[in-house]
Structures are given as C-alpha cells and as structure tokens.
C-alpha cells in the first residue's frame, strides 16, 4: 500500500471490504482521490474506475461506497451526512447510479475510527456484519441477527459491541431484496433505496467506533470565530428566518415558517415540561425554534406528546422530534417512543383518504406513529412518500380490485382504511417487506415497475399532480410549487429526487419578496432571479444562474458532508445585515457516469423528463397568472436552453461538452466518453 498521507480534514486512508473473500484491506486516500473532495465525488470516482456501466443492482460486481466528507467529525456545524453510492434498483427504465445521504453519527464515527471511506464489494455466502474499531476491523457472523427488525438488530449489535458505536442495519425488506428498502442508522436515520444491495451481499449492518483525533488547519480561536458566525446566521429548520406568528421582536412573520417555537408553547411530555420563553433568538435556544411534532401533527396534539428534539452529530438545531404517545402504544402494540421528522413523521395518514389532510385528528396521529415505526423496523422505503401516494391512488380509483387476484384481494382488510384503523399499515408493510402477493411484491418495486406490471400507463401518474410523480421512478422534491422554472429543471437533472434544498430554503425563508429580490441582487446579480411563489414570470438568465449556483452548492454539500436542510446560509434572521447571509460558509456533478450507464448522449430527450401535470391548473388559469404554479412548456424548454449554455453543456442534447469536463478537472473521462460517442459533436 502507498504511504498514508494525512491531511487536514482527511485521515489519509480508507477500507476495502471484499465480502466474497472476507478480506479487508487499507487503501490510501491520496493520490487516487486528490481531486475528489469526498462524499459523492469519491463514490462516483470509484464507480467510474471499477464498476462497468451496465452492472445491475444485485450483481456481485455492484459496489457500495460509504463516504463522509472532510468536514465530518470536525465539529463543523451540520456536517454529519454520509453519502452512500451504489447502483439503485428503483430507477426506471433501467437501474442507474445514485446516492443516499444518511444522517446520525456514522460520518463522525468513521473519521474517528481513522477512515475517509469504505468500499464494499463482492457477496458473502452467509450473513455478516462489518465491525470497525480503529485498526481492529473484521467481518463477524450475523446469523443470529439476520431476520430481525432494525430496532432489535441495532440493540443486539450494541450489546455485542458498544452502546457508543455508530450502528447501521437493514431490516427484513432488504433481506428479501425489496428495491424499496433502506439502511437504518442511529435508530431512525435512513438511507433510502440502498437496502436491497446490502441484503444481496448478506451484509446485515456496519458497526463503527474509534477514538482517533480529527485535525483541522484553523487556529482554535479562528475556528471558534467561524463557528460563532455560522451560528449567528442560523434560522430554524430549512433556514426559515422569521417566526410563524406575529412577534414584536421580529419585523416579519410567515404562517408557513418552520420557526414555530413561540412564547408559551409547552413541550408537555418533557420531565419537567418545557415552557418556551419570549426570545428564541439566542444561540443557546436554536433547538427550541423548531418542533417537528407540532408542525406535522398539528399544534395541540404535537405539543401534547413532545418530549424533546434530537438529531445529527454537530447540529445545533435538532430537527427530529422525540415523542411519547402512550395512547397509540396501548391501542396498536407499538413502542410509546417515536423519533422522526418531516414526511416520516406524518405520512402514515396519507394511506387513509378520510384523514390524509386532517393532521389534527387523533386517528391521523395514530397512523403516523404506527406507520413510521412499522416501516422503519421492517426497513421499507417510502421514496419521499411515493409509495403511499401510489397505494392511495390505486385504492381510490378502484384499481386494486381490477388487478389483484380475487383471493388476494379478499384477504386484505380494506374496511380498516374506511375506519381509519392504523393497524392496516402493519398488515400492508408486512406484505411489502416479505413480498407477499401481487400487491406486496409490486409496491416494493417502485412506481413505474409496478405500473408496467399491472398494465397501467406511466402517463396516468405523470399527468396527475396528486401523485407528485415526476419520472425515472422518483417523485418531485420541491419543484414548481416552490421555485417555478428553477424547481422544474432541478428535478429533471438527477437520477432520483434531487434532495436539494438550496431552492426552497431561499424561496420559503419567510422573507417578503422585496427582501428576497434584494438578496438575489447581492448573490446572483439580479432581483429577477426569484419570483414570488404562485406569481411566476417567464424564465430568464438570472433564474438559471441561481440554479447553476444551487446545483454547485448541492454537489459541494454532498462532497463535504453538509446537511442541505440547513445549508447554504444565503439568508439570515439578522435585520441589521438586511437578512443577507454568507454563501461562503460551506460542484462537481455526476453527469458523465450516468451517460455511460445509459450509453446515451441525448440526455435532454431521454433523461431530463418532466411530468405533464406541471402544465395543468385546476381552475385552468394560464401560466404566469398570479395564484397558479402552472408552467408553460416552451418556457421550460427555454429554461433548459439557458441553463445548459451557462454551464457549457450542449443545449441540444443536454450533455457536457469536452470543454465542460476540462473546466472542472475531469479530463480523465474525456477519452472514454469520446470512444463511446458520448461527447456531443464528436
């Protein structure tokens, strides 16, 4: 092995784990990855070098690359995202490369154990788990843990190793090779869509602990100053910087803001109950600005069951709610404690048409508690809620009765849906995790594969905005409803949902449009870079310049290990600074590998899909009319033209030019892309 070169932010080495042979070896980070910052960039480089483009997800040749970034473990705020890159089984019409981003403490623990990355290859003949503790690393027998749910599996591994270790495991869904499955870490943090790859390799989990120092270049006082400045820019979740109700301490407020920690709110299940004070602007009260249970379950019952917040290593906000619901536990035989956030905290109710939009009802809360505990324990992935919306549309339209065998249809307790009985979810997710029947098997395959099997046109979904379905097997993730043309183009560029909040963190920050336009002028040269939501104007170069910046920031965050729910900090709660943040607080895109997989140079035609529902309006209001988020097709195509020119990609095909690769130091891909006819004009 080459000499280990430690650098600030890097341990200088990683691990290669061959499950076929059982051999684990150290590999140097440098010089091989000298041009890759970390995270996804490192993962994509491994796949470019080592994995043939047509590799299938469950092939032995497929690999898993676990890679945090140079910020991980350093104490830099919000720096605990680990990128896990592999060939995804849920992407349509063919599996393609993508990354999951898992929070918790895995990133920090891997660095503290002394490693920048883990490359996992091959397949084990028997269930194993990977144990890492500094220089002690080995594959251990997991026979007694295989078959267990994620909660019990994590506890068993903690008992065998250390309660202080970072533990990530798969559940029965992954073991049964369900494509819609996850890796679960730190009890509730998940990496979506990658579970079946672990299952196919018989890798039950990864346990990491260590006590190696993390070296940073900055002087201690300088580091403290930077950290304090970063804290000063913090708002609430998704960088919402104004409160959700009028407050004399603030100039502005917005009813949809996630800064919902208001004076007098009581977290009632804390011991003793926590009563929020008048001023949440103090850096020592950042974690009180946000309460997920209140936001997603409704204020009365959310606060009633709120214990405290929790979250990832080195994050002061703590976006997860820990709740205690004794009523749901007694009725449905689940754990009284639940820890979750965002869609995972509420999507259980989406299955039930009567309560899907009624978050304040106890039945909705019960469905949420039962749904997330059951899904997480079985290791089923929701694909950003797409699984639930698929089931619901099939149910509401009477399609299940048409496509399922009569015996299977009659075995399903449909009346529980009408009764809003959350135990239906326990039945449903069990069927998915164990691939039981036609419904269980195909709901677990992702949307277009399910539709194709049942003879339903994909366009029936992509033309129906209620499904949120976008294309390639994934749903929208903050599209035109949040950022007009910028959101549309962004959602077309990735193989799965983009998992990017650089758009919505700005447009829904809570600031009035006049202030946002001033900030847009500061960072992107024109106030025309942003419109008021629901009052969109035709596309322009300024919007696409902002999109270019957003994508570069997203890629940078995925390489550094930063959380995109909080970064970038272009807005702040500070009136004295005109609410302007600092975009230097924290890229490379992965287009080339995707083109090799598809053997396709015309990415614009055959990859960058947008759904038909973005061109519809329930009241048939024209695009660019105040009050509608309807888009205009010619305007969207023009947006692509502008964007591709800005980033030096060929507008006709949406493929990077030879010069574009040179501009970002990817010269090494040019000979291969030329040979395979994947550089436009060559």
What are these regions (language model features)?
Residues 1-195, 200-239, 260-262, 266-285, ...:
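Protein-protein interaction/assembly regions in multi-subunit complexes
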């Amino acid at each position: 092995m080459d000499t280990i070169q430690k650098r600030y932010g890097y341990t200088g080495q990683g691990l290669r784990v061959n499950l076929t042979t059982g051999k684990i070896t150290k590999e140097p980070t440098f010089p091989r990855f000298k041009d890759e910052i970390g995270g996804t960039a490192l993962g994509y480089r491994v796949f470019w070098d080592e994995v043939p483009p047509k590799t299938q997800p469950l092939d032995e040749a497929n690999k898993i690359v676990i890679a945090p970034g140079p910020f991980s473990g350093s104490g830099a705020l919000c720096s605990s995202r680990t990128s896990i890159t592999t060939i995804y089984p849920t992407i349509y019409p063919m599996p393609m490369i993508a990354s999951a981003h898992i929070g918790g403490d895995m990133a920090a623990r891997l660095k503290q154990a002394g490693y920048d990355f883990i490359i996992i290859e091959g397949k084990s003949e028997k269930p194993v788990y990977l144990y890492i503790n500094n220089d002690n690393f080995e594959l251990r027998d997991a026979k007694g843990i295989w078959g267990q749910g994620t909660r019990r599996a994590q506890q068993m591994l903690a008992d065998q190793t250390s309660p202080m270790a970072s533990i990530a495991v798969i559940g029965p869904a992954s073991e049964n090779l369900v494509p819609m499955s996850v890796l679960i870490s730190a009890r509730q943090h998940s990496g979506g869509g990658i579970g079946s790859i672990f299952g196919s390799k018989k890798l039950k989990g990864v346990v990491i602990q260590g006590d190696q120092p993390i070296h940073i270049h900055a002087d201690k006082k300088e580091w403290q100053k930077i950290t304090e400045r970063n804290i000063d820019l913090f708002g609430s979740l998704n960088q919402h910087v104004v409160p959700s109700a009028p407050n004399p301490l603030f100039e502005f407020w917005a009813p949809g803001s996630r800064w919902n920690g208001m004076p007098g709110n009581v977290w009632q299940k804390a011991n003793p109950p926590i009563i929020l004070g008048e001023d949440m602007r103090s850096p020592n009260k950042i974690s009180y600005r946000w309460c997920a249970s209140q936001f997603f379950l409704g204020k009365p019952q959310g606060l009633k069951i709120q214990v405290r917040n929790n979250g990832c290593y080195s994050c002061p906000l703590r976006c997860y709610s820990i709740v205690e619901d004794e009523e749901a536990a007694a009725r449905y035989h689940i754990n009284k404690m639940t820890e979750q956030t965002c869609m995972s905290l509420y999507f259980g109710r989406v299955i039930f048409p009567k309560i899907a939009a009624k978050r304040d009802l106890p039945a909705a809360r019960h469905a949420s508690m039962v749904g997330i505990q059951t899904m997480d324990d079985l290791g089923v992935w929701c694909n950003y809620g797409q699984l639930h919306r698929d089931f619901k549309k099939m149910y509401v339209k009477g399609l299940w009765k048409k496509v399922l065998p009569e015996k299977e249809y009659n075995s399903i307790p449909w009346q529980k849906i009408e009764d809003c009985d959350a135990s239906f979810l326990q039945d449903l997710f069990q069927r998915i995790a164990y691939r039981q029947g036609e419904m269980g098997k195909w709901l677990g395959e992702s949307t277009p594969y399910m539709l194709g099997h049942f003879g339903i046109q994909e366009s029936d979904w992509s033309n129906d905005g209620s499904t949120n379905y976008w294309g390639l097997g994934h749903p929208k993730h903050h599209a035109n409803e949040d950022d007009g043309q910028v959101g549309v183009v962004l959602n077309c560029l990735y193989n799965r949902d983009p998992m990017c909040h650089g758009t919505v963190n700005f447009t829904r920050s809570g600031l009035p449009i006049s202030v946002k336009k001033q900030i847009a002028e500061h960072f992107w040269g024109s106030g025309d870079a942003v419109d008021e939501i629901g009052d969109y104007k035709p596309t322009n170069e300024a919007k696409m310049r902002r999109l270019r910046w957003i994508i570069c920031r997203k890629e940078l965050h995925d390489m550094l290990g930063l959380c995109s729910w909080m970064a970038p900090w272009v807005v702040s709660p500070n009136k004295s600074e005109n609410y302007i943040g600092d975009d230097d607080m924290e890229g490379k895109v992965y287009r080339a590998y995707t083109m090799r997989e598809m053997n396709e140079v015309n990415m614009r035609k055959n990859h960058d899909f947008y759904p038909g529902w973005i061109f519809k309006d329930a009241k048939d209001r024209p695009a660019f009319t105040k009050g509608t988020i309807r888009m205009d097709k010619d305007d969207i195509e023009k947006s692509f033209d502008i964007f591709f020119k800005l980033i030096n990609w060929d507008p006709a095909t949406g493929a990077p030019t030879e010069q574009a690769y040179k501009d970002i130091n990817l010269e090494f891909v040019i000979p291969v892309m030329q040979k395979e006819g994947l550089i436009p004009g060559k």
